[in-house]
Regions:
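Condensing-enzyme catalytic core mediating Claisen C-C bond formation in acyl metabolism
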Residues: 156-232, 241, 354
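Active-site-adjacent elements of ketosynthase-type condensing enzymes
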Residues: 52-56, 135-161, 203-223, 247-262, ...
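Active-site-proximal alpha-helical scaffold in enzymes
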Residues: 20-33, 82-85, 90-134, 172-193, ...
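Short, well-ordered amphipathic alpha-helical segments that serve as non-catalytic structural scaffolds
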Residues: 20-31, 85, 112, 183-185, ...
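Single conserved hydrophobic/aromatic residue that forms the stacking wall/gate
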Residues: 1-13
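Active-site-proximal gating segment of KS-fold condensing enzymes and close homologs
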Residues: 49-100, 142, 146-150, 252-266
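Phosphate/pyrophosphate-binding loops at sites that engage ATP/ADP/AMP, CoA/4′-phosphopantetheine
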Residues: 27-39, 188-195, 225-241, 263-267
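Active-site nucleophile and cofactor-binding loops and adjacent substrate-binding regions
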Residues: 14-17, 40, 74-83, 100-108, ...
């Protein structure tokens, strides 16, 4: 909020853009990135929002019904469309390189970071400001996901977002933004940047199966995971930890478990698997970015958080979903995101060593 007010933008941006601009400012400051010392055309932005601004749409639709089409605000479209998060981050910080808005539902944040990674790999940018943002806790947002039976109906908050538990019955919607500064390694080293971890692999696939359900056999998500490992030059047996999509819905947690077993075989039983959504809820298009940051910090601190609320699993959910937290070295972390429409994305991180 202070960041936005200092720029005079608090009343212009809708919430998903406010979150993104504020988070980007924090990331740029933390990275010690000084735009005056960079070629602005080599610093880009890849910030996605899965839905855009429902608030703007709801407000102007009410105005349409009450006062007619002539009273609809002229800024409805620019305030509503999902690419405004990336656009406003670029404007706020003078980023003149490639600017992307990836929209792949709940895989948006992960794809956004992955596409930023590819942009740097291809030499199209030295630095990318990347992540996701979302603000869909509105009447139509809650009603829509409730009608889809995706939200938890538990009256006990402690049992409302419990990924992989046999009593899971849906997710709790969250909102916010997570943004990171991705940088070509030699460029980061030359300017003495603080390096938290390395992003070394990115894998994607499409289920081509159903508009809301992941593929039942897990083949799509398994392919994305294996593609990320292959891209990073890591054998499946070298991985010890996965940050799962883990939405606390019946189908996702079951089918993602099948995907992990399909990708890793017997090694799946040696993996530690957790869900950050057990603590912060499901941030939709920002979820993958939040979970990416979680993995970065877990690698840095040598800590794997527990899956909160997990008490008892069902027969087929027989992997280690981290009922307890672990204090141990995390050499690699794989984070998964699965989006409506069958979009699958995985990112592989590794511990940075000089």
């Amino acid at each position: 909020r202070d960041c936005l007010l200092s720029r005079g933008l608090g009343d212009v941006y809708k919430r998903q853009c406010q979150f993104a601009v504020a988070a980007a400012g924090q990331a740029i400051t933390d990275a010690g990135l000084t735009m005056e010392q960079e070629d602005p055309y080599m610093v880009g932005c890849s910030v996605g929002s899965g839905i855009g601004s429902l608030q703007a749409m709801e407000r102007e639709y009410d105005r349409l019904k009450e006062k007619g089409p002539g009273r609809v605000g002229p800024m409805l479209v620019p305030l509503m469309i999902s690419n405004m998060a990336a656009g406003n981050v670029s404007i706020a910080y003078g980023l003149k390189g490639k600017s992307l808005n990836v929209v792949t539902a709940c895989a948006t944040g992960t794809h956004s970071i992955g596409e930023a990674y590819r942009t740097i790999q291809y030499g199209d940018a030295d630095v990318m400001i990347a992540g996701g943002t979302e603000s869909s806790i509105t009447p139509i947002g809650i009603a829509g996901f409730s009608a889809l039976t995706a939200l938890s109906f538990s009256e006990d908050p402690e049992r409302a977002s419990i990924p992989f538990d046999k009593e899971r019955n849906g997710f709790v919607m969250g909102e916010g933004s997570a943004i990171v500064v991705l940088e070509e390694l030699e460029h980061a080293k030359r300017r003495g940047a603080k390096i938290y971890a390395e992003l070394t692999g990115y894998g994607c696939s499409s289920d081509a199966y159903h508009i809301t359900s992941p593929a039942e056999d897990g083949s799509g998500a398994a392919t994305a995971m294996l593609n990320a490992l292959k891209d990073g030059g890591v054998e499946p047996e070298e991985l010890t930890y996965i940050n799962a999509h883990g939405t606390s819905t019946h189908h996702n947690d079951l089918f993602e478990t099948r995907a992990i077993k399909l990708a890793f075989g017997e090694h799946a039983y040696d993996l530690k698997i957790n869900s950050t959504k057990s603590m912060v809820g499901h941030l939709l298009g920002a979820a993958g970015a939040v979970e990416f940051v979680t993995c970065v910090k877990e690698i840095q601190e040598g800590y794997i958080h527990r899956t909160v609320g997990l008490r008892e699993t069902e027969e087929e959910l027989d992997l280690n979903y981290c009922r307890d937290s672990y204090k141990e070295e995390v050499p690699y972390a794989l984070t998964n995101s699965l989006g409506f429409g069958g979009h699958n994305a995985s990112l592989l991180l590794k511990k940075y060593t000089e």
